[in-house]
Amino acid sequence: MAKNRKTPNMNLPVWFDGQNINEALFCEEFLHERRIIFANGAFFTPDGRVTDDLPLRGEIYDKLKFCAVNNIPRKITNILEVLKLEAQVSDFPPEQDRIHVANGTLLLNGTFTEGRPAIVRSRLPVGYNPDAPAPVIWLNFLDGLLYAEDIPTLQEFIGYCLIPSNKGQRMMVIKGNGGEGKSQIGAVLSTIFGTNMKDGSIGKISENRFARADLEHILLCVDDDMRMEALRQTNYVKSIVTAQGKMDLERKGKQSYQGWMFARLLAFSNGDLQALYDRSDGFYRRQLVLTTKEKQVDRADDPDLAEKMKAEAEGIFLWAFEGLQRLVANNFKFTESDRIRENREAVKRDNNNIFDFMESEGYIRRKADASISSKDFYEIYRMWCEENSLAPLKARSFSDAMIANAGRFNLEHCNNITNSAGRRVWGFMGVEAVARPHINGFYDVSSCTYVPEDWRD
């Protein structure tokens, strides 16, 4: 259709007869002039997803304002609804092998194509400049914030967030005591990711079933100050970290739908990300936990540091892209230092004291041909907690945790254990009791401190 097509006998667009606007014809002409599609509940252009429709409304208004029609704002809204139908495509899957930047498209193999002719899901506001200088201020900042062996992991994770993929199956938590400047990372990343990054709350994601829909089309979600409370449920967080393709999303007052989810989670915190009930290894295995260096007492903070690092955005992008290429070459397995592994293990132990209990002495003994009932096992565990001033898990949580980690301790959960009364009950093969807290008849009294009545004065 020709641009600004006119009617044969009037100097007017074909979609306006002098009194009324034909929305369908207007949208047909608009799409002929403008590269835009509507898919997965959003408009997309060569600039990426339309996050604010006000500029789009402004374009429509510029074409309508000469028309003497009533209630133009409502007419614009109607046109937008028709435009969704006219520009509709069935699906718009993410492209995991390329990064669309301000001045072109960069493939994972390093090939760069200048220009932006195609409609894309996301386009980063940073440009690709292979000759950009090294981000000296950024690198010096990281050197003072993190241990040297942990910086490659951060480099790979930021690079991982440049593409719409969850193949890495990891989220990142950067933990410190406060005042180290770790949140400056989020400020710098906002310059690189633009509207493809969102400030959010992992706590909200875990407890609000509508929060996941807010992360649709987003590359990175940053929790700048993660709450210290343990998560009551972890399934929403785990599903985001491991999403491969579409997942079920829900918005208030609307029917749930299948949407693309590839948001990566990055949190800054003064503590660990813990679960209130989830003792599974999977929850902790998905965390990359980085600890910051202690802040030097004589360090002078630069209030303009974030702005100085933002000026190095092109160099930081090259640095992150190098990390992405290394991650892809390693089949999306992150570089992990011994410290990161120890951090993850420490978080797991802090939230689940069965590991320390199983390594204790004087309470149980691991033995291949031995067995113990679940009830006796839990009573010994309770005694161990009492004598070490620790809060015990509930009986069901203890059993679930032991079952989940049975392979680690060479145990077998079965229902053919014979208890002291001669009845067959549930229990574990591969462990025997050393302490026997129930012999004195007092559940919470340690057998180590019990004194028989006939010994007392």
Where is each model-derived feature located?
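Modules that initiate DNA replication and primer synthesis
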Residues: M1-K3, A39-C67
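Feature primarily recognizes SF3-like P-loop helicase cores of small DNA viruses
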Residues: A2-A39, K65-D457
